[in-house]
Each structure stands twice: as C-alpha cells, then as structure tokens.
Amino acid sequence: MKTLKITRLLSLIATLVFMLIAFLPKAINETDDWIMIVVLAVAFVALPTNLMYYTKREKSSRYLVDTENGMLLLNIIVFGILLIMNAVGLVVVLINGGGSYWGYLSWISASLYIILNNIILYKAKKTLSANLQ
C-alpha cells in the first residue's frame, strides 16, 4: 500500500510540475526542456506502477472484483488510454527536445489519471463499506 501511495504522489508531483512548465514559461529558464523530459519519465513510470498495484493489491475487495459493475474493466481501459497518451507524449518530447504541444499530453493524461483514479477508488471504498455494514 505504501508503494501505491508513493506512485500516486509521484503522478501528482509530475502533473503539478508540467502545469507550471506549460502555463508559466517565463518563470522557467532554458533547462525547461530537460525538466519536462525528466518529469515526463517519472509520470510514465508512475502510471503503470499505479495500475499494477491498483489491480493486484486492491482487487481483493468485492466491489472491484465484481465484473457486473465493470469497475476493473473501466480501470484497465482508462489507464490503458492514459498510458498510450503518456507514451506518445514521451516520444514526441524526446524527438523534439521538449516544448511541443504533443508533449503536454503527458500532464493532461497524468491529471486525468489522478482525477479518475481517485473517483474510482472513492466509489469502490464507499460501496464496499456499505456492503459490509
């Protein structure tokens, strides 16, 4: 569970740094391209790690395993799409040396990942606690 929290924190940090780089370009010096590449790599590693721990460690709860509500399938589809967006963003940033609009797919996907993952996790915990009462 600690690894899951750490990778979620890494995703959040990566998202915040990308938003700063994207919206505050005057505050960043010439090294912003390398900062983008490093932070994008962190987000790229954090997303699949989150997916792995989310599906392996938390699938024991009855709510997530229940295929009738499709939560696990939704997780796999959503995280798969976000991982593809992240991979595309990483490749384009590496090819262009940063600063590309395609590179911003990475922080968009990280933002969506954080929002959707927390909504899914909250709903799963709420339903599981209601079922146990």
Each language-model region and where it sits:
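Juxtamembrane interface helix immediately N-terminal to a transmembrane segment
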Residues: 1-10, 67-78
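Alpha-helical membrane-associated segments of multi-pass integral membrane proteins
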Residues: 5-15, 19, 38, 86-133
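Hydrophobic alpha-helical membrane segments
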Residues: 42-49, 69-92, 108-114
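N-terminal signal-anchor transmembrane alpha-helix
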Residues: 1-48
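Membrane-helix interface/capping segments
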Residues: 51-74
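Membrane-water interface of transmembrane alpha-helices
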Residues: 45-59, 119-123
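Membrane-interface segments at the starts/ends of alpha-helical transmembrane spans
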Residues: 24, 30-33, 68-69, 97-105
